Amino acid sequence: MITTATRWPSPAKLNLFLYINGQHDNGYHELQTLFQFIDLCDHLTITPNDSGEITLSPPIPGVEKKDNLIWKAATQLQEHTLCPLGAHIELEKILPIGGGIGGGSSNAATTLVALNFLWDLNLTNKELADLGVTLGADVPIFVHGFSAFAEGIGEKLQPANPKELWYVLIKPEVSIATVDVFSHPELIRNTAKQPLNVLLSASYENDCEKIVRRVYPEVDYQLSWLLEYAPSRLTGTGACVFAEFINEKEAQHVFSLIPDNATGFITRGRNTSPLNQALEEYKSLCNI
């Protein structure tokens, strides 16, 4: 067991497109989506110990410990492997909550991947992903760590290699719960499934965007503003919206014009997760 503190990235993702093809009786939706990581990250500093306890800092406002995905991921990993070890986990929160960029799922995945290494558990990525999907449908993509085309409820992954563009990401002054969008009676749920090559050659869209723009005027305003400058879309169920650019200079120019009431970021697409890169670096340091 490594006993020193190590720092792990917990990256955001974008849904470059998102199509909803149907709904299961259990409420989950059939979808087709293209995930890409971005280099905007939370960070987890993890210090393993032999206490058997999982402690967290700082608390996330409005989130009880038992509902914290970091704590749930760590305790689930303990229980699955009968691991007697513990850890203190400190979260540096950058990613906006309720933004549709996978912050909570990414935190859970980083916890699973990091503790699997730090506790020397040797679970495969598939085993970690199978644990993670019980915490959230997006957790497997963060565990596997490659950009991917996803089907099913998001768990069927096929590696993909979209262009690593620059993005201006805006978080409107509203947080959106995924369940509120997916349960809306007017949400599009019958988009026909298409082969990946057809989807990649068409213009990218998000089936959640129409209803989100209508229900949340803050999203509509920021997306309308971005569309004046570049191709722009909602990611996931929102609230974050993004515009895409070929180079950093163009992104920087539009970023400089963002309205004062908006929270924005410049970021770049990454087809290999920063988490994967960190894991390989730690393995190299430990001669694994």
Curated annotation (Swiss-Prot):
Active site residues of this protein: 13, 138
Pfam families with a match to the protein in the record: GHMP_kinases_C, GHMP_kinases_N
Gene Ontology MF annotations: 4-(cytidine 5'-diphospho)-2-C-methyl-D-erythritol kinase activity; ATP binding
Associated pathway: Isoprenoid biosynthesis; isopentenyl diphosphate biosynthesis via DXP pathway; isopentenyl diphosphate from 1-deoxy-D-xylulose 5-phosphate: step 3/6
Domain of life per record: Bacteria
Reaction catalysed by this enzyme: 4-CDP-2-C-methyl-D-erythritol + ATP = 4-CDP-2-C-methyl-D-erythritol 2-phosphate + ADP + H(+)
GO aspect biological process, one term: isopentenyl diphosphate biosynthetic process, methylerythritol 4-phosphate pathway
E.C. number(s) listed in UniProt: 2.7.1.148
Residue numbers binding ATP: 96-106
Family annotation (Gene3D superfamilies): 3.30.230.10, GHMP kinase, C-terminal domain (3.30.70.890)
Keywords associated with the record: ATP-binding, Isoprene biosynthesis, Kinase, Nucleotide-binding, Transferase
Cleaved signal peptide residues: none
Family to which the UniProt record says this protein belongs: Belongs to the GHMP kinase family. IspE subfamily.
HAMAP family registered for this protein in UniProt: IspE
PANTHER family: 4-DIPHOSPHOCYTIDYL-2-C-METHYL-D-ERYTHRITOL KINASE, CHLOROPLASTIC
Function: Catalyzes the phosphorylation of the position 2 hydroxy group of 4-diphosphocytidyl-2C-methyl-D-erythritol.
Protein name: 4-diphosphocytidyl-2-C-methyl-D-erythritol kinase
Gene source species: Aliivibrio salmonicida (strain LFI1238) (Vibrio salmonicida (strain LFI1238))
Lineage: Bacteria, Pseudomonadati, Pseudomonadota, Gammaproteobacteria, Vibrionales
